[in-house]
């Protein structure tokens, strides 16, 4: 499984529930994604200065991840509206992207 992870803080003045509901509108339109999860820092507990929200998107293959990104770029199903919405809700200075995989690889 390939896990594309985004950490971000919501912009000041933006309601967290509004952010999450808008993120779900975007994520629900990614047809090649296996599943996703949105989590929020609990009680400020963390070992380093990571942003408050974490979004994990799971893809069965790198091709599925690439197809999802192509889906956004091609604006299929007017997905760019929700993607732009994501960028409007988060503090751009805090966005961090990661790509993880299950290890060891499955044959």
What are these regions (language model features)?
Residues 1-9:
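Active-site-flanking beta-strand signature of metal-NTP-handling nucleotidyl enzymes
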Residues 1-2, 46-49:
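Short, flexible turn/loop "capping" segments at secondary-structure junctions
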Residues 6, 55-57:
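Conserved RNP beta-strands of RNA recognition motif
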Residues 9-19:
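Short, surface-exposed ligand-recognition loops at beta-strand->loop->(often short) alpha-helix junctions
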Residues 28-35, 48-49, 58-97, 105:
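An amphipathic, aromatic/His-enriched active-site/gating alpha helix that lines ligand/cofactor pockets
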Residues 39-45:
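Short, solvent-exposed loop/turn elements at beta->coil junctions and helix N-caps
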Residues 51-53:
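Residues on conserved beta-strands of the protein kinase catalytic domain
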């Amino acid at each position: 499984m390939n896990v594309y992870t985004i950490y971000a803080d919501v912009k000041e003045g933006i309601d967290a529930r509004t952010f999450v509901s808008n993120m779900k509108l975007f994520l629900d339109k990614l047809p090649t994604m296996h599943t996703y999860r949105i989590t929020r820092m609990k009680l400020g507990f963390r070992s380093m200065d990571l942003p408050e929200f974490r979004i994990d998107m799971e893809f069965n293959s790198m091709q599925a991840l690439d197809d999802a990104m192509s889906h956004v770029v091609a604006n299929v199903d007017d997905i760019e509206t929700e993607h732009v919405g994501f960028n409007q809700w988060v503090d751009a200075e805090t966005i961090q992207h990661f790509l993880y995989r299950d290890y060891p690889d499955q044959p």
